Amino acid sequence: MTPTTPIPPPAKPDTTTRWRRVLRHPLARMLAASLAMFLALALSFALMESLLPKDTLIAWPNLVAALACALGYWTYANRVERREVTELGGSGALAEWARGAGLGVLLGLLTLAPLWGLGVYRIEGLGDSSPLLKQMPEMRLVSVFEELLIRGVIFRIAEQAWGSRRALVLSTAVFVAAHLPGEISLTGVLVTAAASLAFTAAYQISRRLWLPMGMHFAWNYLFSAVFSVPVSGHEAKGWLHGSMSGPEWLSGGAYGVEASATALLVWALAAALLLRRAHNRGNFVPRLQHSK
């Protein structure tokens, strides 16, 4: 008898659907997750405007939109990525958010105190307390949406595919690009980049989004709703009637305190310390890690 070559068994059919194979690409996953959030956001605003009377539209649409963004993100991660959404886990969420908010307030005060001492920032009077409540829903939406998008979608997916360092570069570039419209200076670009690195490092440390959400919310709320200091070029009318004057490198000019030298020093130090802590904890990913 002549020897014969064993015939290999037939290959198992690829049961993975084509759309799921496409969604495995990092950029496609980022796009799909972003669309899930944007659609939820748009739908929530449309429903609120059609269902609620105009006098309630100040707060409720932003609060509902924040929840809708989180739901859109959760739905994508749970149904498409088919995993437990641990970064939005409820256990300990309030405590983590509060720690982040405390850190955001600390960074804000460290930024503003030297400006107040130098006479760059001045308190000219006391207004009514309505901005403290009116601006809270808007700042909550901003912090939730941006952290879900930049840290939860872009950084997380890029990190899984290309490692932490490349993901840091990509997510920071997107965060800075989103804040470019307006009268932003080079210092403002650097402050925005440093803040993005700090927010991302906070996510890396905990692998949850509550800490950076708290930091982001507190920073924006403190300056806009309390001290009446422009945030990212947006005019602010807060509880305290404050004003900024002096050289632009200190006051930040029209862009606000986020383009000042003190903010750059504070955020650069915060980013360095948080990134070092994340690295020391072994939370830098060097290579591809598949999602569950």
Predicted regions and their residues:
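Membrane-helix interface linkers and caps
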Residues: T2-V22, S44-A101, W116-G127, A278-V285
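Hydrophobic H-region at the start of alpha-helical membrane spans
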Residues: A32-A33, P61-A66, G102-L106, S260-W267
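Long, hydrophobic/aromatic N-terminal blocks
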Residues: L103, L107-S143
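Hydrophobic core positions of alpha-helical segments in small-molecule transporters
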Residues: S91, G100-L103, L170-S171, G214-M215
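Transmembrane helix-loop-helix hairpins at the membrane interface
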Residues: T2-W19, R29-M30, S34, F38-L41, ...
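Juxtamembrane interface helix immediately N-terminal to a transmembrane segment
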Residues: H25-P26
